[in-house]
Amino acid sequence: MKRILSFIPVHVLILFKRLGIVVLLLYVTRLIFLLFNLESFQNLTFIDFLISLWFDMITIGLFFLPYYFIYLLPIPIRGYKFHRIFFKILFHTTSILLLSLNLMDVEYFKYTSKRSTFDLFSILSAGNDFQQLISTFITDFWYLIFFLILLIVISEYLFRKTQIKFQTFTTIQKNFYKQNIIAFLLVVPGLFIIGRGGLALKPTGIIEASLYSKSENMAFI
């Protein structure tokens, strides 16, 4: 395993670790959703859990596209402070958005029997009503805010574990550009394909998930 990892550029390994953090935390929110809505999902199977994990990876492949595209650009600026700050902010902003949506579904599902993503645009277009909904949500479902804060703290702790010193323009090594260009050309398309759910002409959606799971379990996926 160490020999295989030695061929993978360090910045690519770090990217995978960071995306792995998001996979882990998203799945935690999925389990929280299940815990609070257990009566609606009595017939879940192991396949349902695997499919839900795959859809989390698809979500990350899509929402983190700006992150991994810019991060993998073959430019020796990863060692500079502004680069570290920018990507930390971008990482947490994107992950907090996804975690918040999943946690909001914990209670939203109880009232509508569907996930909030189906009604997200109509909710956002509500204007002042949306602000009122947010205020009510924070007041009535404060424990979800607690979960979110806890997950953010865990995310930051794990993110710091991935930080190391990188090459700069003054410390660049001979094979930097060759190694980084190859990594960019391989990893970015690979993650984008995951974000589409595969190589099919049409991106994978919830309809495709219904082929592998029962209709009553679709909201879990």
Predicted feature locations:
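Transmembrane and membrane-interface helices of multi-pass
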Residues: 2-220
